[in-house]
């Protein structure tokens, strides 16, 4: 009987692939080719295994398709290895195809509704150079966590965890060159060299990027004042160019099976520039007795709209260095720890000459700034296993930031400002994870204390300030895993603290009729998110409710003493609510693998403006379609399309 069992297994494997539930269907196996006997083989008895000649197998081929996307607890997992994504040229190209990720107008990637994610590479926060030269073929999977746990900083909106395979042993080198063309050309060249043994890994990297893109940005601001409505507008055309030189050295040493140490250095040299041409215009309120229903061209004191042209050049330079030491330890079967020590130094400067013309009048303005910052930080994470399904994570971190800077402007009211910043932060967290049967859950609490000081070095100034923040951040998640369904419900609180550029009381020049000033009364923004995720077969969906208290937004005002100018500043607003729905579907049809994403976010928000309640309710939606075609000789063709309607974000409305 043994021979028939072996033969049946081979035939079944050769003629089917796994179904959605992971089982092997046998409908394709022909019963005529399987022989069965009732006799059995006794212990210590030799058995001769024979196969029916008609059923002999010349070759065995197993064909199957694993889904690229699946839910794991409250995270979306994207499989890269052995999927079409493994053939994408760069990590950026892979991230574009992760459901929930989208590319902004300036080319950066963000998570829908949560901003740019914090990226971890094998559970260590990744540097920009690491991500730039990461070999896509080494990536196993990428986790998108939209409800990060208590161990993550309270300002973190989303987390990307990239898990890779270890590089093969030996000496290796890789050179990569790629070119991107839209309106203008962007090119990138990089070289990676390394030496890997069972215990030691030494790698070095150098990369150069010439990044260019053009921007067309029309913008209007309708400013309500006591004497009526002012209109200020800009039609901006910009050309942007940046040259990056990035270097990195990594040394990892596996001291034993339980301990690993490493050191890393990253350097970045950036030179960038932007040239801009603008046509700007403004209009006063209608004079008394003016017909407000007629065309709005003739509405200021002189009887017509005012126009002027502006040209500017902005050049920036940045130099940064980052050192990292780490120790990973497994002290016992149930106890492990991670320790990270970091030092970073950043130095940048920029200058911006502006020329503005209105008729025969011309005004020139020069803005310049520079800053130097040093950052020291340490972090420890401990994991204690209680049992196979229960564990406790706890840890803490400390950081110190010291910096100083200087801003100069030849414009009226501005002059020169020198300042100094000093920030210290301490944090601690505790998180419990458990599970019973089909259910898993986690619950965590995080505490953060932040002290921030700003000192104006130019003169004794009321701008000098010190702020203290003490906040608690709870979070939890619960998951139900069934054979065909996956359900997850999670909650998280986050914060966004105002920067000193928003608080200091400084004045920044934007144009001859627009200045930006700070607001020292700003409060932190607190956000509460409740998320439900579900997966069924090829479909994944998400519903999210977000409440934001004390949102920080721009407002525009017209000073009574200078009516030709308007002032942009920051202000806290009351409750804003957002409702988001998301759907993803993907399937395999022979050589064609389509994947469809769609999301919609509805915003509820209103503002009392000069006694009138103005509603900024509105919907924002986007959709994308990715198509992968498997071609002969291991080639792949991919076609993608995406669209969004711009929509309403806070008080600002965007066009597609």
Predicted feature descriptions by range:
Residues 420-423, 464-469, 495-549, 566-580:
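Outer-membrane beta-barrel signature, preferentially recognizing the C-terminal barrel domain
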Residues 21-84, 104-106, 145-146:
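Short, acidic, small-residue-rich periplasmic hinge/interaction motif at the N-terminus
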Residues 81-82, 169-193, 235, 421:
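Short strand-turn segments of transmembrane beta-barrel domains in outer membranes
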Residues 184-212, 227-276, 318-331, 476, ...:
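Transmembrane beta-barrel wall of Gram-negative outer-membrane proteins
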Residues 188, 215-228, 274-304, 349-359, ...:
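Outer-membrane beta-barrel translocator domains and adjoining extracellular loop/strand segments
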Residues 246-271, 307, 311-457, 479-486, ...:
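Face-selective signature of the C-terminal outer-membrane beta-barrel domain
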Residues 71, 102-147:
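Periplasmic plug
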Residues 59, 91-94, 109-110, 129, ...:
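N-terminal periplasmic accessory domains that precede
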């Amino acid at each position: 009987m043994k021979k028939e069992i072996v033969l049946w297994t081979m035939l079944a494997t050769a003629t089917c692939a796994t179904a959605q539930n992971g089982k092997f269907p046998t409908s394709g196996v022909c019963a005529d080719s399987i022989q069965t006997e009732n006799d059995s083989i006794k212990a210590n008895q030799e058995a001769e295994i024979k196969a029916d000649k008609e059923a002999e197998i010349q070759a065995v081929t197993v064909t199957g398709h694993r889904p690229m996307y699946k839910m794991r607890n409250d995270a979306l997992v994207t499989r890269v290895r052995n999927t079409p994504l493994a053939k994408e040229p760069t990590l950026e190209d892979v991230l574009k195809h992760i459901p929930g990720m989208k590319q902004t107008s300036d080319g950066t990637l963000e998570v829908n509704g949560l901003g740019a994610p914090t990226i971890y590479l094998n559970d260590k926060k990744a540097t920009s150079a690491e991500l730039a030269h990461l070999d896509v073929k080494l990536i196993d999977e990428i986790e998108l966590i939209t409800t990060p746990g208590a161990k993550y900083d309270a300002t973190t909106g989303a987390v990307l965890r990239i898990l890779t395979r270890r590089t093969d042993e030996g000496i290796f080198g890789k050179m990569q060159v790629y070119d991107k063309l839209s309106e203008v050309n962007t090119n990138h060249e990089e070289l990676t060299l390394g030496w890997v043994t069972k215990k030691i890994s030494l790698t070095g990297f150098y990369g150069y990027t010439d990044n260019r893109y053009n921007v067309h940005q029309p913008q209007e601001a309708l400013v309500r004042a006591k004497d009526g409505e002012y209109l200020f507008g800009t039609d901006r055309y910009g050309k942007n160019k940046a040259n990056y030189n990035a270097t990195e050295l990594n040394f990892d040493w596996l001291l034993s099976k339980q301990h690993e140490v490493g050191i890393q250095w990253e350097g970045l040299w950036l030179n960038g520039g932007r040239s801009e041409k603008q046509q700007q215009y403004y209009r006063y309120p209608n004079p008394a007795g003016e017909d407000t229903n007629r065309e709005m061209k003739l509405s200021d004191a002189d009887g017509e709209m005012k126009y002027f042209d502006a040209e500017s050049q902005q050049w920036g330079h940045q130099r940064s260095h980052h050192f990292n030491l780490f120790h990973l330890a497994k002290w016992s079967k149930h106890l492990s720890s991670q320790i990270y020590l970091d030092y970073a130094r950043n130095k940048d400067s920029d200058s911006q000459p502006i020329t503005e013309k209105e008729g025969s009048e011309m005004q020139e303005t020069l803005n310049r700034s520079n800053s130097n910052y040093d950052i020291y930080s340490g972090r420890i994470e401990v994991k204690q296993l209680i049992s196979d399904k229960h564990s406790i994570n706890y840890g803490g971190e400390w950081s110190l930031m010291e910096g100083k800077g200087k801003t100069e402007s030849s414009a009226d009211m501005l002059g020169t400002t020198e300042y100094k910043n000093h920030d210290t932060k301490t944090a601690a967290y505790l998180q419990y994870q458990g599970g019973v049967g089909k259910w898993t859950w986690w619950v965590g609490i995080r505490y953060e204390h932040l002290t921030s000081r700003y000192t104006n070095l130019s003169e004794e100034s009321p701008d000098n300030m010190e702020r203290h923040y003490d906040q608690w951040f709870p979070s939890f998640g619960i998951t139900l895993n069934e054979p065909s369904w996956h359900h997850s419900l999670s909650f998280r609180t986050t914060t966004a603290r105002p920067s000193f550029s928003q608080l200091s009381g400084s004045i920044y020049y934007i144009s001859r009729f627009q200045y930006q000033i700070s607001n020292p009364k700003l409060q932190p923004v607190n956000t509460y998110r409740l998320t439900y995720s579900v997966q069924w077969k090829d479909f994944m969906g998400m519903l999210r409710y977000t409440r934001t208290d004390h949102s920080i937004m721009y407002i525009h005002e017209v000073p009574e003493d200078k009516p030709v100018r308007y002032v942009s500043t920051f202000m806290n607003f009351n409750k804003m609510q957002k409702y988001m729905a998301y759907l993803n579907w993907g399937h395999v049809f022979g050589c064609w693998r389509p994947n469809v994403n769609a999301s919609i976010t509805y915003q509820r928000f209103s503002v009392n403006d000069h006694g009138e309640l103005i509603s900024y309710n509105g919907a924002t939606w986007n959709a994308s379609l990715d198509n992968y075609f498997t071609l002969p000789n291991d080639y792949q063709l991919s076609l993608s399309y995406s669209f969004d309607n711009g929509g309403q974000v806070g008080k600002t409305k965007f066009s597609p």
